[in-house]
Every structure is written in structure tokens, then in C-alpha cells.
Amino acid sequence: MPDPLSPAQRHTCMSHIRSTGTKPEMQLRKELFRLGYRYRINKKRLPGSPDIVLAKYSTCIFVNGCFWHGHMDCRYATRPKTNAQFWRTKIENNRERDLKDYTFLESLGWRVIVVWECELKKDRIDATIASVRKQLDANRESCLAELADRRKRREEWQAEIRRRKERSEEIQVNVKIH
């Protein structure tokens, strides 16, 4: 079925679709801020430019639109009947790109939380916020444990360097005596 809009009309329609500052994203950001979480938004230096970045928790949050990111079995993710092949390819490419970005972020040590647009509807938002909060708190505990482990390894490494330095000085003293 051909597109009922002219290319100029379609361009105008598509240019009004926002990629940042969407209503679902703003809802989640507002709730996180209210709960005391502080974050950065749309961090361009990270793969996929996450919508919300909580560095303290080593966590990136993506707020995905059900349609654009192909949320499976979601009533908001129905594909248009016109230009069906284009939309199938577009959404599949989006899903593949998202998976690649999430995997890369995780390989860099980030934890990834994906929140779907439908999870931020009135009847589900409280449960979604509670779930995100639970994940963030778990991530914080994990981050604190990692920091403690790093601190311990750094102290052990510094102690080893001190021992080597002392041995080196002892050897130099012994060489001077003989």
C-alpha cells in the first residue's frame, strides 16, 4: 500500500519525532530525581548515547519507545501496514544496534537497564520505578564491593612496591659495604 503522504509531508511528520526528552524519559527522570538519584542525560561518549547515566552506580538506563525499538508482544509496537518491508528492516536494525550497544556497555563494566515506554503508563509506573530502584540499589552494593576490592588490591600493590624498594636499598647498602 503506498504512503498516503507526499515525501515533503512525511519529512515534516518524521522531523517532529524526538529522540531525547520524550515524555516517558521525562517521567522516569523526574521520579529518579525525586528519589534522590543524580544522573547525566544523553551521554554521547558512551555507546548508544544512554538516556540516563548514573555513574555512581555504573548504570546506564535506556528508555525505549515500544514502536521504534520493537518491543515484543506489546500493543504499542504494531507496525504500519504501509511500507511494511521498510518498517520491518528499520525496527530489526534498531534492535540489533541496541543489543550491540548494550553488550558493548556491559563489556566496559556498565550495567544496562532498559525501560520500555509501556512500562511507564499510569497503571505500571510505580512497579517500574520500584524495579529500577531495586536494580540501582543492587548495582550500588556491587559497585561499593568493587571499589573496596580495588582499594585492597591497590594497598597490596603499594605494600609490594615498598618491600621491593626496601630490598633494593638493602642490596645497595650491602654492595657498598663489600
Model-derived features with residue positions:
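Nucleic-acid endo/exonuclease domains
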Residues: 1-114, 118-178
